[in-house]
């Protein structure tokens, strides 16, 4: 079973928003209590937070699917649902969040650094929040918005000041054990170290620094031999690279200079350019017979390359203290050379006033509407409720979607897709006005001839049975077989004029004449009626 994992694929799902409640207040002696449905709660977020006590991504290796809590639904009596609980995932310092395509999203460095990986969905509004002067008792509520779901790749890049690189069994783990209190596994066979080991070194009065022991490299590591270059990501943040060279190796064809050239070639093959990092050479195992002579022999050549050289023995601890002090001074100078981070500058880019909140594009035989608002509205609409559908149509019309569709040549009945929902577009009253302005609708019952070139919207009434059909159009035009919009919409009644008592009486008399068989030639009545009697329910206004 693995004990160290530095790369995982995380499947994060934020909580869904709670549904709004559709409720009417019921109380003794209050016949018109009004709507009192509460709002749904917000869905929980999925957050990543750096925890200094976490050193591996092992938890996400066994539990890659993480889901936050959902919001609770609203209830009657104006009771709002509780928000969903946020899910906080603890990650090691130095965790990099990548998209599945490899694009870096965020780099989490420093204890307490937090990033919201997936946002919870909005809670749906209850009918109490949807009430208006025209819609005093909505018979619907909004659905909760689904939370975000995404896949992310988490990679751990150790945050260390010094990286120890070299061949297997060169003594890197032993050096970490004598420099710090770390106790990595040490044995006399290659590839004992399979995962990076970190140790904190305190040398003299200098600030502590961190040393990382990277698993051994061999020729061809860039092509995947040995452990490959898989763990070299852990030295990307290091400010100093230390080559640990074995002066006591008995393998043929190996010596400190050859080992140095091989390791440098493998580092050059790594994707990240490490050529700007300062180098330091440690000649290890000088306590072994003939190893000290070899160290003295190669030291001038190494110094000629501009490299600082230290001869040590981790077994006898010869030269270890001097090496620790030298490393501490180098790290301190490198830290001082790093410019202090500038304060984060927040740039505000306000959206232009005339910039639309949506997009409309033609696709195939229909149109596709995009934009944050239309997509969110569709997700929060209960399509089993006709009044909710009418409310959605009104919102889209007020946003300008219907006018834009008319400009692009849309006609009634064309397929319009918003998100995962496809509609057969039937314009509302304002949408028909836009069609008239655009000159569209010829031959389909919605053109100028059908409307009589009127400036206001048309409302109709249909009488079933033997009474036949009748239609009333403001402005004197007669239109038949035009579909009504959904009941309860604002735009159906937007152009209705408030009538005087005499006008309402005249309309009532006209309806009576029609019931007596006198016919109905020119009227502004509005309503639905059925049966052979043609009982009209008109005069709404």
From Swiss-Prot:
Subcellular location: Cytoplasm
Binding residues for GTP: 166-173, 191-195, 213-216, 284-287, 313-315
Region (Disordered) location: 63-84, 497-541
Record-linked PROSITE patterns: G_OBG, GTP1_OBG, OBG, OCT
GO cellular component, one term: cytoplasm
Pfam families in the record: DUF1967, GTP1_OBG, MMR_HSR1
Cystine residue pairs: none
Positions of the OBG-type G domain: 160-332
This protein's record includes keyword Mitochondrion: no
GO biological process terms held by the UniProt record: ribosome biogenesis
Comp. bias intervals (Gly residues): 528-541
GO molecular function, one term: GTPase activity
Residues where Mg(2+) binds: 173, 193
Keywords on record: Cytoplasm, GTP-binding, Hydrolase, Magnesium, Metal-binding, Nucleotide-binding
Cofactor dependence: Mg(2+)
Function (record text): An essential GTPase which binds GTP, GDP and possibly (p)ppGpp with moderate affinity, with high nucleotide exchange rates and a fairly low GTP hydrolysis rate. Plays a role in control of the cell cycle, stress response, ribosome biogenesis and in those bacteria that undergo differentiation, in morphogenesis control.
Record text on subunit structure and interactions: Monomer.
Protein name: GTPase Obg
Naturally occurring in which organism (per UniProt): Parafrankia sp. (strain EAN1pec)
Native organism taxonomy: Bacteria, Bacillati, Actinomycetota, Actinomycetes, Frankiales
């Amino acid at each position: 079973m693995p004990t160290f994992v530095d790369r995982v694929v995380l499947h994060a799902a934020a909580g869904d928003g709670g549904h709004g409640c559709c409720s009417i207040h019921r109380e003794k002696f209050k016949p018109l209590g009004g709507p009192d449905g509460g709002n749904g709660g917000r869905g929980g977020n999925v957050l990543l937070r750096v925890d200094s006590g976490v050193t591996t991504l092992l938890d996400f290796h066994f539990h890659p699917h993480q889901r936050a809590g959902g919001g609770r639904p609203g209830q009657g009596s104006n009771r709002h649902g509780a928000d969903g609980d946020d899910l906080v995932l603890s990650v090691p310092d130095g965790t990099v969040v990548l998209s599945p395509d490899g694009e870096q999203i965020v780099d989490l460095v420093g204890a307490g650094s937090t990033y919201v990986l997936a946002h919870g969905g909005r809670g749906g509004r209850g009918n109490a929040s949807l009430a208006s002067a025209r819609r005093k008792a909505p018979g619907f509520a909004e659905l909760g918005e689904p939370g975000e779901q995404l896949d992310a790749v988490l990679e751990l890049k150790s945050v260390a000041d010094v990286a120890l690189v070299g061949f297997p069994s060169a003594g890197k783990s032993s050096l970490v054990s004598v420099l710090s209190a770390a106790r990595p596994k040490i044995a006399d066979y290659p590839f004992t170290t399979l995962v990076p080991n970190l140790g904190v070194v305190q040398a003299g009065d200098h600030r502590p620094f961190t040393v990382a022991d990277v698993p051994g490299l061999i020729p061809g590591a860039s092509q995947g031999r040995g452990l490959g270059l898989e763990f070299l990501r852990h030295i990307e943040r290091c400010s100093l690279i230390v080559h640990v060279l074995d002066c006591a190796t008995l393998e043929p064809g190996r010596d400190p200079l050859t080992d140095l050239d091989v390791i440098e070639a493998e580092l050059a093959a790594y994707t990240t350019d490490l050529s700007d990092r300062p180098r330091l050479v440690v000649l290890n195992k000088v306590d072994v017979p003939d190893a000290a002579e070899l160290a003295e022999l190669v030291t001038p050549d190494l110094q000629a390359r501009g490299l600082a050289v230290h001869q040590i023995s981790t077994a006898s601890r010869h030269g270890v203290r001097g090496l620790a002090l030298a490393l501490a001074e180098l790290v301190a100078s490198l830290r001082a050379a790093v410019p202090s981070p500038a304060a984060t500058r927040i740039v505000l880019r306000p959206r232009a006033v005339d910039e639309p909140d949506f997009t409309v594009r033609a696709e195939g035989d229909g149109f596709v509407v995009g934009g944050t608002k239309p997509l969110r509205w569709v997700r929060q609409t209960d399509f089993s409720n006709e009044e909710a559908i009418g409310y959605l149509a009104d919102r889209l019309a007020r946003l300008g979607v219907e006018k834009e569709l008319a400009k692009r040549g849309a006609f009634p009945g064309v397929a319009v897709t918003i998100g995962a929902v496809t509609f057969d577009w039937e314009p509302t009253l304002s949408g028909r006005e836009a069609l008239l302005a655009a000159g569209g609708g010829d031959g389909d019952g919605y053109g100028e001839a059908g409307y009589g070139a009127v400036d206001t919207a048309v409302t109709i009434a249909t009488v079933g049975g033997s009474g036949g059909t009748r239609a009333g159009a403001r402005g004197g035009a007669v239109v038949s077989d035009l579909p009504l919009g959904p009941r309860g919409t604002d735009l159906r009644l937007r152009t209705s004029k408030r009538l005087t008592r005499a006008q309402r009486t005249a309309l009532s008399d006209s309806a009576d004449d029609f019931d007596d068989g006198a016919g109905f030639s020119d009227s502004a009545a509005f309503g639905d009626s059925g049966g052979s009697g043609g009982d009209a329910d008109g005069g709404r206004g």
